[in-house]
Structure formats: C-alpha cells, structure tokens
Amino acid sequence: MESLTLQPIARVDGAINLPGSKSVSNRALLLAALACGKTVLTNLLDSDDVRHMLNALSALGINYTLSADRTRCDITGNGGPLRASGTLELFLGNAGTAMRPLAAALCLGQNEIVLTGEPRMKERPIGHLVDSLRQGGANIDYLEQENYPPLRLRGGFIGGDIEVDGSVSSQFLTALLMTAPLAPEDTIIRVKGELVSKPYIDITLNLMKTFGVEIANHHYQQFVVKGGQQYHSPGRYLVEGDASSASYFLAAGAIKGGTVKVTGIGRKSMQGDIRFADVLEKMGATITWGDDFIACTRGELHAIDMDMNHIPDAAMTIATTALFAKGTTTLRNIYNWRVKETDRLFAMATELRKVGAEVEEGHDYIRITPPAKLQHADIGTYNDHRMAMCFSLVALSDTPVTILDPKCTAKTFPDYFEQLARMSTPA
C-alpha cells in the first residue's frame, strides 16, 4: 500500500483559496440538470464524488462542458425530471452526495435504473429514504441486502404525505426536498427523530431558492412543498469553498501558527461547518472573520466538552486537534460518524490510540486525553478522505506521522498534502 510520511512541522502560515464545497457542488449539479435553461457553475470541486455525479448526469442524457481544470461547468438543464432511455445502471462509487439525491430524483416518472457503488457504499444505510419514497408511490427494490444499495428504481413517485427519519443522515431529507417540487402532487414531509446535521438542510433550501423554488419550513419538523413546479437556472452560480476542508488549515493555524487564512468562505457562507472556527476559538485560538475569509492565529489550546451534532464532518478535525490541547476533550452526539465513509468513531478511536492518546469510544461520543509525547505511527485511513487529512495534523508535533493510502483525499481534496506542504515550515 502507498504511504506518505510527514516530517515534523515547526510552523504553518499563509493563505489558501479553498476548493469548492462537495455538498454545494453536487446539489448544484443536480438542480442545474433538473432546471430550465443553461447554468454556468464556477469553483466547482474537482473530486471523485463530483465525477460520479457528472458521469451519472451524462448517462442520463444531460449535456455539459468542463473547463480544462474541471472547476467550471456549463450545463444545459432538462427542464424537468431526468429520463433514461431503456434500462440503465449507474455506478456512484462511495458518493453519498450522489447516491441519496439521485435515488430520489430518479423516482420521478417511469425510469428503470439501478444505482450501485463501491463495497463501502453497500454498507451505508439508505432504508429510511427508500421507506419515505415508497410512501410517495415510488417503486424501489433492494438487489442485495435489505435497506442498503444497490437499488432498482422504477419511477412512480407522485408526492403526498411522507415521513422521514432525520436521525441517521440529513441527506435523506435533502433528497426528498430537492425531488418533491417536481412531483405531480403536493408533498408534506414530516421529520421524525432528532434531525442530524441541520445546517446541511439549510444548504439544500438555499440552493433550491437560488434555482427558483421556495418551500414552507415549519421549524425543521415539517416541510410543505407545492407539486408541479420547475427549477429555473440562475444563469451563473459560484460554488463557495468547502468549509469542511477549511477545518484542517484553520486547526493547523491554531496549533502551529502564525496565522492561516482560508478564502472562499466567511461569515456569509451557507455551510454549517464554518462554525468549526467558533470551536477553535473556545479552545483558545484567535479567529478573525471576513465576508469571504476566516483567519486563525495560534493560541494556548485547552480541552472542550461539546455537542458536535451540528458540524459532524469538521468535528473530526477537533478530535486530532485535541492531541494538542491541555486536558481531556469530549465530543458528543456524533452517532452519525458511524454511517459515513467508514465507521468514523471506531476508526478515529483506533488511530488516536496508535499515536499514544487515551481514548474512550462511546456509542455516540468520543473522549480524548493526549499523551505527554505523541508516538510515530502508521495511520490507517479506511479509504476515508477525512481520516487522512485529520491525522496529517499529528506532524505539527515533534514526531513524524505516516499516512497510509494518502490518495484517498481525492474524494474531496486531491492536492491536500501539496497545499499543506506549501504553507509549512519544516522543524
């Protein structure tokens, strides 16, 4: 297996313009494909997950052109639901941001489509979404294991009164919200259970509004969506920087700044993960906000005990930042780490122990006490981009760290290690 050893880093300083947000990129691509008119998307993320969405749209007859660096996409919308000619199989890798929304959108009309992906995708639950779509009339079969992909979709979704479980993934609700306006009938979506990662629903609603569709949101418990609507292209749309990707650089600034400035997100950003900066501030770093930048300056870091349900992806970065904080850090209400690219609670606990931390792994929490001195270890990444990027921070000590399968960052940030090196002064 390929590996990358990062030597100790004395200081991290400088600015980085962030690649586009994965969450925004894949939502914008799907809405542009469903919309009337041509949309020009700029600062699109070039990554595995976005390529899977683009390949799927192409197979569904959507025409688009990409710039040489794949960050600008001119896409001609279909002016309504996507149609497959004949039976189609779409391979979506491990891209939840493609699998979940497409599973819903392709239930409009009368298609026959199979959605499949990598082995890990077949372990990521989708049963709650399928149950909700079936309530709206969709014909869906599981081809292997009940409640998991691959799925066969045979259209049939018309809207109506639908319940969705909000406790596992906000992507299920996102998928229903984006599909419902194109259903022939009105849809009432009721959320049962605690809604996880609520800020991601705000991204969805924000983008739907940009494409001309507004819905009634009753305290995130019930959404009322008029049927028979159309999405309309906004013309040009700038994808904001990825706030989850910003977390690694901001944390590096907190641990070993200098000052690190990330551009492409700021106080006006719609992504909930910008709140990660508030957590660093609570830990002792100094944060400066602009409309389109966030800067972080080193501080004396101390442990925190916090509910992280609102920023689950960025919370992973706090777990490795905790190695540099005084005291024991507790991250709570993060059960949905277990159904991501890997079981992130298990993976994080396992790898933190390798570098010497004392770790308590609960059903939905993790408690981390840093060692007096970090140990050099080979870090397993579990084919999970965020594991690789989180554990790069270990090099901000006087100990090297070896990252196994470093190229797994291609899911959201192909040149992450080059960018980190560019801003780092070796010890």
Curated annotation (Swiss-Prot):
Pathway: Metabolic intermediate biosynthesis; chorismate biosynthesis; chorismate from D-erythrose 4-phosphate and phosphoenolpyruvate: step 6/7. One of its GO terms (biological process) is amino acid biosynthetic process. Pfam families: EPSP_synthase (PF00275). Keywords: Amino-acid biosynthesis, Aromatic amino acid biosynthesis, Cytoplasm, Transferase. It comes from the Bacteria. It is found in: Cytoplasm. The active site is at D313. Coiled coil: none annotated. Its EC number is 2.5.1.19. 3-phosphoshikimate binds at K22, S23, R27, S169, S170, Q171, S197, D313, N336, K340. Catalyzes the transfer of the enolpyruvyl moiety of phosphoenolpyruvate (PEP) to the 5-hydroxyl of shikimate-3-phosphate (S3P) to produce enolpyruvyl shikimate-3-phosphate and inorganic phosphate. Monomer. This is 3-phosphoshikimate 1-carboxyvinyltransferase.
